[in-house]
Amino acid sequence: MSSRFSRFVFTLSAGFAGAVAASAELIPSANNGGITLPAGFHAVVVADGLDGVRGVAVAPNGDVYGRQRGGGIVALRDTNGDGVADVKEMIAEDQPGGSGIAVHDGYLYYSTNSEIYRRARAAGELVPGGAPELVVSELRDRRQHSAKMFTFDDDGNLFVEVGSPSNALGEPDRARGAKGVSDEKVAEFLSEFGGVWKFDPRQAPQTQDEGEHWSTGHRHILALAWNPVSDALFGGMNGRDTLDVINPDLFEREYNAIRVSEEFHELKKGSNLGWPYTFYDPIDDRRLFGPEYGGDGEKAPAPDRFQDPIIDFPAHWAPMQLTYYSGEQFPQTYQGGMFLAFHGSWNRQGDQKGYNVSFIPFNASGKPTGEWSVFADGFMGKGQIASPNDAAYRPMGVATGPDGSLYIGSDHNSRIWRVFYTGE
């Protein structure tokens, strides 16, 4: 396991061979559109003034799609190669808003909070000509942690995460003195929530109950991506809140602010990530019981009961979309790795943290090395902030383009950036 803070930054100097420069026609925006990047990287603002873009997807021809929180999908096309979208269309405006979106196997897929839809998209079509087709329905939705993100494996199987509408299944939830529910109630709850379900889109339409229950013990995972080298599913989980509220005698506010990691896992069939019973402490590098289940800051589960994270990211950073970097434009160090958008904290003590896009390197076998670094930063704006509303931007979406550019979306002061590499 990794990510003690000593691993916060790793050396990139060894991997800058093998990069393919971006098109010379791309013109960086002033100050890279308000974000900071490593040397040799630049950003152009593809589109601005959008309506709360959540997930981002890029088609093989470079068209960009953003799933909007308030409803519909924004479709963007750059016709002159300067990186800025000069054609904007809206899709699915009559359907509820959502978060998940992907271009896969001739279709544009997108989610609401309870369904997955797709529309057939012929090559070169900005607005898919196909009618909406229901792929998965009856995905559980109880408001809290209801967003549905998804990804595909190389065989075309669809993996959908169903979040847990709770902090830690305490009664009453998030309240002082809350007690955890029985093991039987936890098992019943996790049969419907807090896991990934696997579907075959060729068998559409299906319901959640017809899917294969792949993994369990999640609080909420929006960051899902498939690694084609290791043939494995990876995800970043949003950790729990309010340790100090549940039992302030044992957990101080500062403890809650720094000791509940955002866990990065390989999601194997049968993986159990330990929610609602536990959280992972990134300072002491260990899994501990939460106060609802007898936790006192020392009590730990049996070593093999729950899966430990590969990386324990800092507390409350809020991992959102995750993308596998399949391109060759960026230096070799980045090739075959993953980029993860962190939305940023909203309720931690003191200044808020996160608000970046981080890079996770993988080895030649498609396994995470356990290291990570902040790749794109500056979304928070100048100085520290006390509230997310004070941030300039909040990274939400991230996707790899066909030329190896990286696209980043913000749902606050909503815009999409295209990050490219020139080496200069």
PLM features per residue range, with description:
Residues V44-R69, A318-Y324, L340-A341:
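Beta-strand-rich domains and repeat architectures in extracellular enzymes and scaffolds
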Residues Y65-R67, Y110-S111, F159-E161, F234-M237, ...:
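Residue position within the beta-strands of beta-propeller blades
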Residues E25-L37, A147, S164-D209, T216-N389, ...:
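Beta-propeller domain segments
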Residues V56, I101, F150, I221-L224, ...:
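Hydrophobic core register within WD40 beta-propeller blades
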Residues V45-L50, M90-Q95, V135-R142, E212-G217, ...:
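Surface loop/turn motifs at the tips and blade-to-blade linkers of beta-strand repeat domains
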Residues A102, S114-D153, S166, D183:
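Asp-box/WD-like beta-propeller blade repeats and closely related beta-sheet repeat scaffolds
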Residues G49, A59, H104, T151-D155, ...:
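Structural WD40 beta-propeller signal
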Residues G81-V87, L126:
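Acidic, glycine-anchored loop motifs typical of Ca2+
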